[in-house]
Each structure stands twice: as structure tokens, then as C-alpha cells.
Amino acid sequence: LRQDPALDGAQQERVADWLRAAAHQLISYEKPGALGNNHHYWRALAATSIGVLSNDNELFRFGVNTFKQAVGQEDSNGAFPLEMARHENAIHYQSFALQPLIMIAEFAERQNVDLYAYTDHGRTIRNAVTFLGHAIADPGIVKQYTSDEQKTNFSAGDVAELEFYFARFGAESAPNSLRNLLHNPATATRVGGNTTVLAGK
């Protein structure tokens, strides 16, 4: 939006105002005290990105707090319990939940808020990434959460957000299964398109 040469300053402000209003409406659907899952995280990513764009700290803080809530829900293995309840798609939903959370962390880093270092009961978002890698390598570890046979048809697009993670921590920071899965270029429309290019900027 800020780089679109077709929009002058007044038009950019008008669009930003509309996005801000839409984001506030979006998060108004949240029920106080409700437990978050990937739907909550995706709403939080929208709020975070628009909050940064429009200098709306309330929207930005909503995203930051949602990220912290997600880390707080990780179990001792790094799994998200609400996503583990997704039967044969448990591993896929662990992956799907990480997409918005990693992107929230990236937005926050650019606002000098280090969410990657945020710890709750001894765990960080990196534990969730590690669990995903282990589960992809050995779906049997999910049997403690669900008896359903796991779908394992993963592609680079399922973990495209990890381009940002690898750019920050190095590919060696994640299990081999994730490194082997993330072929370049990696693309996921939900997190901006070609993340290989975006993470390299």
C-alpha cells in the first residue's frame, strides 16, 4: 500500500482508515476469554499487519497478545493442543497455526518487539516449530493426541513462513524434515506470496 505509486497520500490514508476500521470489526467478533486456535491467530495476523500499516497500537497489541497466548498454550512437547484435536489433520493444523504466528513475530521484530524470545512455562515458538518437524518426520508421535492416521501430503507451501525463520536463525535451527521440505521458491498466498523473495529482502 505504501509503495503503490498509483495512490497519493490522501488516498493511502483513506485506504488505511478503511483497513483499520475493518480490522477492529474483525477482532470485535472475539469472545472475551475464548481459547485461541488457528482462526484466532489468522485474525491476529490481520490485526497486526494493519496495526503496523496504520500506526494503530491497539491492533498491534492484539496481535502481540495473541502470539503470547499461543505460546502459553503449547504443551510440554511444543504441540498446540487445539490443533492436535483435528484428527487426521493434526500435523497439518500445527503447521497451519504456525504460519500466522511466525508472521506476527516478524512484524513485531520490525517494531523492536522480540516475540521469538518470548517464553511461557519454559517454552517459546521455536518449540512449536521443532515439534512440527519431528511430527512430519515421525507422524507416530501424534498418536498420544489422536488415534487417527495422519495425512502427510506436505509441500513447501505448507511451511513457506519458515523462510523468515531460517533467515533469522539459520536452517540448521530446525529439524531436517523441515529443511528438506522447504524447497525454493516457497509460496503461500496467505502470508504474502513468494516468501523466499520476501524473507531475503
Where are these regions (language model features)?
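CBM-like carbohydrate-recognition segments
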Residues: 115-201
